[in-house]
Amino acid sequence: MLRYLISIFLVVSVAIVVSNPVRGEVLTGSGLVDVPTGRVLQHGIFEAGTYLGFREDGTDRSSANLGDAVAVRLNFGLFDRLEVGLTHLWDEENPDSTVARTANLKLLLLKEPETGVVPGVAIGIEKLGNKVFSSDAEAEGSETPSAFLAVSKTFNLPRVHLFSLHVGVGTQRFAFEESRVGVFAGLSKEFRPAFARGDIAMRLEFDGSGVNTGLRYITSSGLQVALGAEALNNPDELRYLAAVSWTNEKILERIDAMNKLIIRATALRNETERAISKKAADKATETPSSQ
């Protein structure tokens, strides 16, 4: 199965490489703020929503690429190995501008087990076109797709408890100024406070050029609200992100939990019926002997 998935991944990647460049994704469920991780969405799980990105100096319309931008996206997982992301974005202040479309792919090579030292490892390709979100210089340097390899590992430390470390290497937007390849890294931690009635995920990352941070809140119904900031180390390039989406993951978790309860209840009922039948058989055996 993995061999066929790799073949499909390579074929689709080649198709993307020769298409028009567009922008990548931010604040996705399997990623951090703007960098990927060594994880993918599980089979049958999808996320659909929208996100907004704008610079601090977005009121200056002397250059269209500093304007606010809105995107609609869909991410879904296949076979617990492949994640596909589709994004449709446009310049909010200039509706007549060219619409950007992207298809991002990520293939899971190694799945991180619940216990053990094996990390999660994934490779992927992002089809980037930074006409809206970035400067002309950045867009010019990102005309080709960005390929990456990401590794993720969860650690359990005293007081800190569970947190995840993510590192990777990538081309194009991840690359350093004088290099074709760069590194990225990040930290993520999830909380489940009683007052929140949901999960809260905090993220901090370095994407090869800047430091980004984000906060995501996931309700029990699957609604996700995320806020983020990019380029914290460069006030002149500081930009903000906001996203709202919905995922079916919580519903599937409830269905899975309900199925487990049904299986357990069925097993208990069968055990009870067997115990009653055995008791009745033993009683029937004892009655003739007593006579």
Residue ranges and their predicted role:
Residues S7-V17:
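Bacterial N-terminal signal peptides
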Residues T59, P95-S97, V132-S134, F176, ...:
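Outer-membrane beta-barrel proteins
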Residues M1-Y4:
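Positively charged n-region of N-terminal signal peptides that target proteins for export
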